Every structure is written in structure tokens, then in C-alpha cells.
Amino acid sequence: MAQKPDGGAGLRGFQAEASVEDSALLVQTLMEAIQISEAPPTSQATAAASGPNASPQSSQPPTANEKADTEVSAAAARPKTGFKAQNATTKGPNDYSQARNAKEMPKNQSKAAFKSQNGTPKGPHAASDFSQAAPTGKSAKKSEMAFKGQNSTKAGPGTTYNFPQSPSANEMTNNQPKTAKAWNDTTKVPGADAQTQNVNQAKMADVGTSAGISEADGAAAQTSADGSQTQNVESRTIIRGKRTRKVNNLNVEENNSGDQRRASLASGNWRSAPVPVTTQQNPPGAPPNVVWQTPLAWQNPSGWQNQTARQTPPAARQSPPARQTPSAWQNPVAWQNPVIWPNPVIWQNPVIWPNPIVWPGPIVWPNPMAWQSTPGWQSPPSWQAPPSWQSPQDWQGPPDWQVPPDWSMPPDWSFPSDWPFPPDWIPADWPIPPDWQNLRPSPNLRSSSNSRASQNQGPPQPRDVALLQERANKLVKYLMLKDYTKVPIKRSEMLRDIIREYTDVYPEIIERACFVLEKKFGIQLKEIDKEEHLYILISTPESLAGILGTTKDTPKLGLLLVILGIIFMNGNRATEAVLWEALRKMGLRPGVRHPLLGDLRKLLTYEFVKQKYLDYRRVPNSNPPEYEFLWGLRSYHETSKMKVLRFIAEVQKRDPRDWTAQFMEAADEALDALDAAAAEAEARAEARNRMGIGDEAVSGPWSWDDIEFELLTWDEEGDFGDPWSRIPFTFWARYHQNARSRFPQAFTGPIIGPSGTATANFAANFGAIGFFWVE
């Protein structure tokens, strides 16, 4: 027991000299060692060893599952009853006495598992062929050795061991499935056997020295206890690099023609080697000197070859025949453009044109009923109609065809009774035949160049001035009622509510309404926005009424004048913070409701902005956002910067010229306003003269009963039960007040300084403030 069995050379000598009886004794001892093992193999190891698709042990490095099987097999082995190599020396000269190699076994390898693969004896008198056995692992105890018999028949104690004759190589190929390793052997050429054997011997040596490497999963198929026999067809098991030519022959079958082809592979789970084996044979497309062990890569076990591009049948590749253009294009309609009429031209009734006529432009002659001529066509000066020429019965003349000036109508030529005349075809001085009396020419007759149609035309039809003036009076009442809210009036509203069907003459109606407003009420209709066409009512310079309003609006307009002054003195713009700071000094605060002004914030940011007195906008590029106030469009027309500056100077008992910059700016604006007013007055006078508008426009009766209150829309609160309560003042009283004004009608100029008279200064102050209401 001092010597350790050699699992390498001793096993090869045992394989060469063993007899049938010795083989039977060895198998019986092996079976007893397995049956009396202390711990049965686990279900995991049994399942791995008896799987249906188990592949033989490979010369490749083991995987994790193979390591687990080795540990289970080592734990299941009997500690002390294992077969000892030195006990095999009791059989004589030709027995196991050659187990001398047990002394030569390395001391670091205490145990080795003997593995008999493809253990089918070749005959009744032949020794058992344990063709492949290799050390696969070590157990926990170095004095124990486990024998693992694969592909050996298990039987009872009294069973006689009969080893059937080994089938031939062709029969094994046909009857047994091929594994991944067996197929991989067939892919190598015979010339590479020696080199591959050396490589495999080196790998087996590495496996033998590794303590944690076990068999591959499903390396051998074990038979069940009932005696059923399974055979392993592993043909590529290496015993220290020894491999016979028979291994390659297992995967090759001979056919009648003498050529060799690869046998089909059985279905199973293919497993690729984690580490490639280097060789000089390179599969197609593989890196240099590397053979990949994956059977599905680079190799095709079924002999399948890459097919060339799929050939389309000749019939399927034929493209449809190209569309063939008809030999002759059939056009039932003759080409009509351009048309060159040769000479002669034969009509339905034979008509011979004496001179050739070439039509200059495109002419379409679809049929005689829709005959068209070119707009600029003129007949030759010397053309005469033949005496016997008759027009077709269904022929219609062109609507814009001009008759030659010197063309005389044939005496026997007559038009059809139902022939329609074009509106501009007959000249005014052309003689009309007696049978044309029933035809009524259109009033839009146009004469030829040498006709005297202008002498026969009478004066233009006079307009109904009374209807236009009546509609203008309605517009005056409408504008005065709409101005109650101080919201600018849109031209579209005037056209929709009052003018209506007189839209073609609406400029004259609006101008007549302006004339009535100026002459009777001292009010002027001013267009403040040329793009949106917004209109407001302002007092004329002669009325000295200032800003129109009622008594209840006096506090609001006074506050508005103060705000306009603050904006003007701060560079024509004032931020919201600056404006509220100035109003706080007057006792006015936002958020506190005033008894007369109401909500101050709403008054400044909504009402005055809607009435176009102020412009409230965001300061550009302000973060957080800030807002500022500017003058509105209405403020520029109802007052001026010079009036506001004089108001501020009067309050502070100072001269307006003390603020030099503001005074010069206000003076320039006043001069520009005078020039614009003079140009506008001249344009109005010219328009009224052209329209015939004079004093007779205001001479007629005046009545308020024809006003349509349902057309008016109101944005402020009011007494909707009594429409007349919406009128802010009595119009006739206002008219007479303007006539009896105690202020002079003519001023010395837009700028009144301290040198003016007291009456002039008083009038200027009131004009600057802009408040003069009828009580």
C-alpha cells in the first residue's frame, strides 16, 4: 500500500495484457465498489451522467458543471474499499504484474478515476478494450480511488459476463449518434493526426494535474439497474494522445460510387469550447491558426454549401412588354391654333373673300354658334362684302367684333330675327334697318373712334341728395350717442349700422355728417387711426368747449390733465411707480376707492386706455416686468403739450418758458399742428365743393325721432329703460352756448405769453385746462 497506482503507463500495460476473465473480475470488483459506496450519487450527478444527449468527455478544459460532477463522484467513492493497483499482481506472468508503473505515479496525485469508454469487447476471446481512460479528478482523501465505468452493463452477482462482438466502424456510424467531438474529428485531415495527438496529450496532462477538474456533463451514458444497455459513440476520446485511424472512419461511410460523405449528425445540445485550439488548418473565414470548437461555426455537418444567388426563372424575369405607341395618333378634332385661313375661304353659303386674311392671334373656331375673333382684328380697308353673300341662319357674331368704319351694309343683307347684338358692337351713328326696331340696344353702347356718341349722351343722372342728406343726419345722431362712452368709433360700425346699402357713396355721407356736426354743434369728426379707421368727436377751435363731457366727468378729466402733465414733464413717458408716487402726494392711492373717481387703478389702466387718452404698455426688456404710461391718440387731438405746459405754469405761478426743453418741444408741436390743420381744412373744402355740400345741408328740418337706439351698444352702466337718458347733454343748448360764447373767437396765436391781455390769458388758461362744460 506504500506505492501509489499510476493512472497513465500502468493502465496502458493493463490494457495490452488483460484477458477475458481478468476483465470480468475487474468489472465485478468495479460494480461492488460502486454499490457499496457510502453515499449514493446525487440526482444532479445522475442526471448529468445519464442524459439522453450526453456527449463524451472532451479534451477541452472542463466547465463549471463538469467540476460539480467530479466533486460528487469523489464524495460518492468508498474510502477504503477501492481497487488497489498492487493487488492486481496475483495472476501470473501475463497478468497485472506490469502495474509496476504504480511506483512511478507522481506523489502529488493520490487518486485517479479509471474510466472505461467504448468498453465493448471485440470478441469472446479478446481482451477488454478500455481504449480511453484518463485521470479526471482527485477525491478528498489521497488513499482512495474510485472507478467509474461508463458504457458497461450492470448485472446481478450471478450473472455471467458476456461481451458481444464489437460492431464494425460502418455499423457504429450508422447505428450510433455522433457527438460534437466525434463530428469535430471528421473535420480534420489525416495529415494533422500527429500534431493533434501531441496537442491532446499536453491538454490531458494539464487535466491530470488539476485537482478541481471533473468529467464533462454527460460524458458517458450509464445503464439503469434493470439491465438495459446503452452505448456511447464517443469516437474522439484521447488516452495520452493515442488515437487510431478508426476514429475518423466512424464518421465516414462508403457509398457504392466510392466517394466519401459525412454522416448526418444526431440532434442534441451543441456546446462550444470556451478556448479555441490552435492548428495549422483554418476553416473558411476564421482567424489565422485557430479552429473554433463550436460545431455550428465555420462547419456544416449536413454537407450544406452556401448557395449562389437565387436564380429567377427566365419566365419570371421577363419584364412586361413596353407600351407601344400607336402608329398614328388619332385626333378627331382638327388643330385650331393658330389658324391661317387660305384664300379663298368657302363658307356654308359660298363666300369668296377677295383678299387673303391672316388672323394674327390664336383663334378657336369650335362651331358657328360660338365664333370668336381676336380682340385686335381689323378688316382690310378696301374690303367689300359680295352682293350675293348670305350669312348662315344660325351664325352669331363675335361680342367684341368691330365693324370697319367705311363698311357699307349690303342692300339684301338681313340679320336673323333672334340674333342677339353684342352690347358694344353697334356704333351710335350706324343706320338701323327697319326690321331692327324691336331690338333694344344696351345702355352701355360704345361707339367707334369716329362716332359722335358723346354728343348723344345726356348729362349724368342727378343723385338723390335728399336721401344722402337724410342718411347723413342719422349718422350724426348715431355718432353723438356713441361718443357718450368716449370709446373711438370704427368705420365698420358706421357702415354696418347706418350707411348699409349706400356703401358705394359712404365718403360723401360721412362728409355731410361732418359738415352738420361742425355747423350745428361745434364738434369735429376726427380720424385718429388711419389703419384701423377709428374716429372720435372733438371740439372745434371756434367752440372753445375743450374736451367734451358731462358734469359728472369733471373730476376724471381734471385727474387726466394732471397725469398728462406728469408724463410730459418726465420725458413723454412715466413708469407706473413714478406716477403712483406723484399721485400719493395728492392723497390718491391705488387700492383705495375714491368717492368721486372710484377705483383709481381701473380708471388709469382700463378706462383711460380704452378711451385712447392713455397708452399703457410694458417697458421693453424689463425683468421683472414693469409698465409705463404714455399719451394716447385722443389726447393729441383734444389737447396739446403747450396747453398742458401752460396749465402747469399757472398752477405753480411760473412762466411756461422756465422749462426751456419742454417749451421748445411744445412750440414745435403746436406749429406742426397748425400746418396739419390748415392742410386738412383745405382738403375738406375741396371735397365739399366737389360733392356740392353747402349751407343747404343744415337748412332742413331736424328731428331726433328717427334714431334707432337698438343699433347702439353701450359698455358702461346706464338707464336702458329710457334711451334719451343716455344723451350726455342737450344738443340745442350746446349749439346756442357755442354761438353765445363770451370768449373771443380768434386768438393771437397758439402761444400766449405774459404780455397778452387779461381776457386773452383767461381764455388761454381755460383752453389749456380744456374744461368748459354746459351746466
Swiss-Prot record:
Ubiquitously expressed in many adult tissues, except for the spleen. Expressed in osteoblastic and chondrogenic cell lines and also during embryonic development. Transmembrane segments: none annotated. Disruption phenotype: Animals show shortened circadian period and reduced total activity. Residues 292-441 are annotated as: 22 X 6 AA tandem repeats of W-[PQ]-X-P-X-X. One of its GO terms (biological process) is positive regulation of MAP kinase activity. InterPro entries: MAGE, MAGE_WH1, MAGE_WH2, MHD_dom. It comes from the Eukaryota. Keywords: Biological rhythms, Cell membrane, Cytoplasm, Membrane, Nucleus, Repeat, Tumor antigen, Ubl conjugation pathway. It is a peripheral membrane protein. One of its GO terms (molecular function) is transcription coactivator activity. Residues 468-666 form the MAGE domain. It is found in: Nucleus; Cytoplasm; Cell membrane. Residues 39-50, 309-326, 375-406, 437-452 have a biased composition (Low complexity). GO terms for cellular component: chromatin; cytosol; nucleus; plasma membrane; protein-containing complex. It holds the Pfam family MAGE. Its main location: nucleus. Sequence repeats lie at residues 292-297, 298-303, 304-309, 329-334, 335-340, 341-346, 347-352, 353-358, 359-364, 365-370, 371-376, 377-382, 383-388, 389-394, 395-400, 401-406, 407-412, 413-418, 419-424, 425-429, 430-435, 436-441. This is Melanoma-associated antigen D1. It comes from Mus musculus. The lineage of its organism: Eukaryota, Metazoa, Chordata, Craniata, Vertebrata.
